[in-house]
Amino acid sequence: MTRLVSGVALAAATLVAIRFLPLLPLRVLACLVAALAAREYLELVDSPIRVVVLVVAMCWVVSSTAVASPLVLLTMALLWVAAEVLFSNHSIQQASTGVFGAVYIGMPLGMLVAVHALLGWQATLLLLGTVVVSDTMQYYTGRLFGRHPLAPAISPKKTIEGAVGGVIFGTLFLTVVGARILPFSGYGSLVTLGILVVLFGICGDLFESRLTRAAGVKDSSSLIPGHGGVLDRIDALLFAIAPFYLYVRNVT
C-alpha cells in the first residue's frame, strides 16, 4: 500500500509540475532533482568530491537551453579534474568519478528541460510516458514469458523476453501518441525513435543497477517510500532522453 500511495502521489506531482509550471520554476525543480540524484550517486560511489559535483550538475540544468553551454561545462569539468589531481589529495579516479556523476545526471536533466522549452509539456510527458510504459511492460512481459536472463550478473530478474515486450509496447506508445505531438517526419522515424528511447532506457536501468550492486545496496536511497531513491526512479530516463532530445533538435 505504501508503494502504491507514494507512486500515485509522485506521478500526480510530476504531471502537475510538467503541465502547469512555467519554465523557470521547472528549471528550479529539475535542479532539485539533479541535486538529490547526484547526492545519491556520490554516496553509491563513495566519492569525496561532493559540493562541486552538485553545483556542476545543477549548472547543467540551468544552462540547458544555451547552445554552447554543454561544451563550456564539459571543458570546465575536465579542467576541474586536472585541478583536483594537482592541488588536492584526490586521485585521478576519484576526480573522474565525480565529473562523470555531474555529466551522467546534469546533462540529461538539462536536455529534458530543453525539450520542454522547445516543444512544451506534451512532448515532455510523451517521453516520460514512453519510459513508464516500457518499464511496466518489461515487468509484466517478463513475469509472464520470461525465461532467459538479460544481464544476470547485474539484474537477475530482468529477462530478454521482458526487454522485448518493453521495446514493443514502448515503441508502439511513442509512435501512436508521438504522431499527434511531435513534428511529423514519417512513421519510420517515430518507430526508430521509439526503439532507441526504450533500448537506451533499458541500458540506463542496468547501469544504475550496476552502481547499486557495486555499492552492495538494493536502492540508491530510501527517500521515496516503497520506491527507493530519486536515482532509482529516473535511471532509465537519464539514458532515454538522449535520442529523444537529438530527434527534437533535428526536426524543430
Label every model-predicted segment.
Residues 245-252:
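Juxtamembrane boundary at the C-terminal end of a transmembrane helix
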Residues 197-201, 225:
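Transmembrane alpha-helix interface/packing and boundary motifs in multi-pass membrane proteins
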Residues 133-143, 201-213:
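Short helical (or helix-break) motifs at transmembrane helix termini and adjacent helical loops
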Residues 213-237:
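Interfacial loop-to-transmembrane junctions
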Residues 137, 164, 231-239:
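Membrane-embedded alpha-helical segments of transport systems
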Residues 1-196:
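Membrane-embedded alpha-helical bundles of polytopic integral membrane proteins
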